[in-house]
Curated annotation (Swiss-Prot):
Family to which this protein belongs: Belongs to the universal ribosomal protein uL30 family.
Keyword Transferase among record annotations: no
GO CC entries: cytosolic large ribosomal subunit
Key words, A-Z: Methylation, Ribonucleoprotein, Ribosomal protein
Subunit field text: Part of the 50S ribosomal subunit.
Name by which UniProt lists this protein: Large ribosomal subunit protein uL30
InterPro entries noted in UniProt: Ribo_uL30_ferredoxin-like_sf, Ribosomal_uL30_bac-type, Ribosomal_uL30_ferredoxin-like
Length: 64
């Protein structure tokens, strides 16, 4: 049986208005599009890098 992947919950706390288009695309890649939305994603180095790129717009709610 496969081991369950670690998951991370990310909440959008900032608006992408007047931000660089790459930051908007990163939010879309994180499955976020409105303030207050929460997305549950696999905890991978790629996702951590995306969170780091928009750390002023998101916060980590929960790590499992």
């Amino acid at each position: 049986m496969a081991k369950a992947a670690n998951m991370i919950k990310v909440e959008q706390i900032g608006s992408p208005i007047r931000r660089h288009h790459s930051q908007r695309e990163t939010l879309i890649g994180l499955k976020l599009n409105k303030i207050g939305r929460v997305a549950e994603l696999q905890d991978t180095p790629e996702v951590r890098g995306m969170i780091g790129k928009v750390q002023h717009l998101v916060r980590v709610v929960d790590e499992k």
